[in-house]
From Swiss-Prot:
Protein name: Hydrogenase-4 component G
Highest taxon of source: Bacteria
Pfam families for the chain: Complex1_30kDa, Complex1_49kDa, NiFeSe_Hases
Taxonomic path: Bacteria, Pseudomonadati, Pseudomonadota, Gammaproteobacteria, Enterobacterales
Cofactor requirement: [4Fe-4S] cluster
Record EC number: 1.-.-.-
One MF annotation (Gene Ontology) recorded for this entry: nickel cation binding
UniProt similarity note: Belongs to the complex I 49 kDa subunit family.
Gene from which the chain derives: hyfG
GO biological process, one term: anaerobic respiration
Gene3D superfamilies assigned to the protein according to its UniProt record, in alphabetical order: Cytochrome-c3 Hydrogenase, chain B, NADH:ubiquinone oxidoreductase, 30kDa subunit
Length: 555
């Protein structure tokens, strides 16, 4: 892609990097003025990522592998860093991995945020991150054959059903705290679950000393499906269905990645419509979580009232695109449908109604003593940079829509609740502004041509955090590689640190405060480190104990 060098961001960072590590950068390729990919010597990969991460305020939202043997004879690993300092940009660090040895130096000992991504690369490609501290599988089940790696480009017979390699679960859960702690397994299955997950809490009496968890029980293989069976625009509708709550955010991130790779200029009206639907999605997600927060502290009147108001956001979505879920609107280059005058006026009416309703509910919520008592000081996550991609890397129409960045310094469950409250009101204000200031342009850019093996990032600040997609185009009207990283993927690894030092009754509140995409898991096994005993109890008992704090299931 041709990029005007005068507007390129990150040049000073790259110059400093080349001075620090002479000869480390083998190649440099611009995707957009804000995005650049550098290929580095593989032995210097940890040094380069560590330098960008710690010395230039880097953030590591996603890393992934790619089977590029048909392109250059190698595998490749990519570490995408969002630079959060004075010069905000994206720097993707790439290293080529020998196809025979399949080894590359692990970055995790230098940057712990890389651990899940490197475990996934090992599972899906069979690459070996040398020095990776956590050697457990991440995605593949215990009975998966050692020599089968789903995302390789090798010919695979999808009718093949390999024999299980083991009849029992062999996954070792890790307790970094008191080795004698009681263990509480939570999950992995529940009849109402949308996605299973297995939690294990290590407790000493009522106190959680550590936690571990295993997910990916229902890995859907969406990335492989997109690469093998779907065209570019068909993947747009697949990305809608990555998540039941923030599907539109994923759809925007995917289309944005392809548009960035090809240099497609999306019409301004399409950008505005995308922003409107993203804020509608944020509304119904935040209202859902606020309702659940009420439930977890025993305030079920608030739970029902927040869900009542949430229905209006679903009605808003149906009014704008014909569906209560924000599906089917995006295309590469723009959107499929316009927002007409009557729809706009009815939506503005709903915005005014919702503002009054939410104001009343928040006043009632904050007047409930149990809310602050139960949520303040628990589930603390150390304060870091206040990040929001709508501000740090504006996309869609967020560079033009007035908005406010809300921060609370507690880092606890109460702070996360209050951020959602403030963002709910801000989303309503953003909707009013966008609906009143829609530009008069076309909806879709057409007539562009696809360029094989062009690639770029796309990103969205979803209600739970950032969704980051990376797309490399193929030469057969299909994607060569699609990496789809949901917000919760980055939220899970920090959960164990948020649970430590809190009580079992706090666990549902802490987990729920992340608003994770996971199931209502069924059972919890308690392992007492002192008595060296384990006990399995239904998760509903843990949830009930968190609400009324009577009749401890640990006794």
């Amino acid at each position: 892609m041709n990029v005007n060098s005068s507007s390129n961001r990150g040049e000073a960072i790259l110059a400093a990097l080349k001075t620090q590590f002479p000869g480390a950068v083998l190649d440099e390729e611009r995707q957009t003025p804000e995005q650049v990919t550098i290929t580095v010597k593989i032995n210097l990969l940890p040094d380069v990522v560590q330098y960008l991460y710690y010395q230039h305020d880097g953030w590591l939202p996603v890393l992934f592998g790619n089977d590029e043997r048909t392109l250059n004879g190698h595998y490749a690993v990519y570490y995408a860093l969002s630079m959060e300092g004075a010069e905000k940009c994206w720097i993707v660090v790439k290293a080529l991995v020998d196809a025979d040895s399949r080894e590359f130096p692990s970055v995790t000992p230098r940057v712990p945020a890389a651990v899940w991504g490197e475990r996934e690369i090992r599972d899906m490609y069979g690459l070996i991150p040398v020095g990776l501290p956590d050697q457990r599988r991440l995605v593949l089940p215990d009975d998966w054959p050692e020599d089968m790696h789903p995302l390789r480009k090798d010919a695979m017979d999808y009718r093949l059903r390999p024999e299980p390699t083991t009849d029992s679960e062999t996954y070792p859960f890790i307790n970094e705290g008191n080795s004698d702690a009681r263990v509480i397994p939570v999950g992995p299955l529940h009849i109402t679950s949308d996605e299973p997950g297995h939690f294990r809490l290590f407790v000493d009496g009522e106190q959680i000393v550590d936690a571990d968890y295993r997910l990916f029980y229902v890995h859907r293989g969406m990335e492989k499906l997109a690469e093998t069976r779907m065209g570019y625009n068909e993947v747009t509708f697949l990305s809608d269905r990555v998540c039941g709550i923030c599907g539109f955010a994923h759809s925007v991130a995917y289309t944005n990645s392809v548009e960035n790779a090809l240099g497609i200029e999306v019409p301004q009206r399409a950008h505005t419509i995308r922003s409107i639907l993203l804020e509608v999605e944020r509304l119904h997600s935040h209202l859902l979580n606020l309702g659940l927060s009420c439930h977890f502290v025993g305030f079920d009147t608030g739970f029902m009232q927040f869900f009542r108001v949430r229905e209006k956001s679903m009605t808003m979505a149906e009014l704008l695109i014909g569906s209560r879920k924000t599906y089917g609107l995006n295309l590469i280059g723009g959107v499929r449908r316009d927002i007409l005058k009557e729809q706009r006026l009815q939506t503005l009416k709903l915005v005014r109604e919702m503002r009054a309703d939410v104001s009343e509910l928040v006043e009632m919520l904050l007047a409930t003593p149990n809310m602050e008592q139960r949520t303040q000081g628990i589930g603390i996550l150390d304060r870091q940079i206040a990040r929001d991609l709508r501000f740090d890397h504006p996309y869609a129409d967020y560079g033009n829509i007035p908005k406010t960045l809300f921060t609370f310094t507690g880092g606890d469950v109460f702070s996360r609740v209050m951020v959602r409250v403030k963002e709910t009101f801000d989303s309503l204000a953003m909707l009013e502004f966008a609906l009143d200031n829609m530009p008069d342009t076309p909806l879709l850019t057409e007539g562009f041509s696809y360029k094989p093996h062009a690639f770029a990032l796309g990103f969205v600040e979803a209600p739970r955090g950032e969704d980051v997609h990376w797309s490399m185009l193929g030469d057969n009207q299909k994607l060569f590689r699609w990496r789809c990283r949901a917000a919760t993927y980055a939220n899970w690894p920090v959960l164990r640190y948020m649970l430590r030092g809190n009580t079992v009754s706090d666990a549902p509140l802490i987990i729920g405060s992340l608003d994770p995409c996971y199931s209502c898991t069924d059972r919890v096994t308690l392992v007492d480190v002192r008595k060296r005993q384990s006990k399995t109890v239904p998760y509903k008992e843990i949830e009930r104990y968190g609400i009324d704090r009577n009749r401890s299931p640990l006794k």
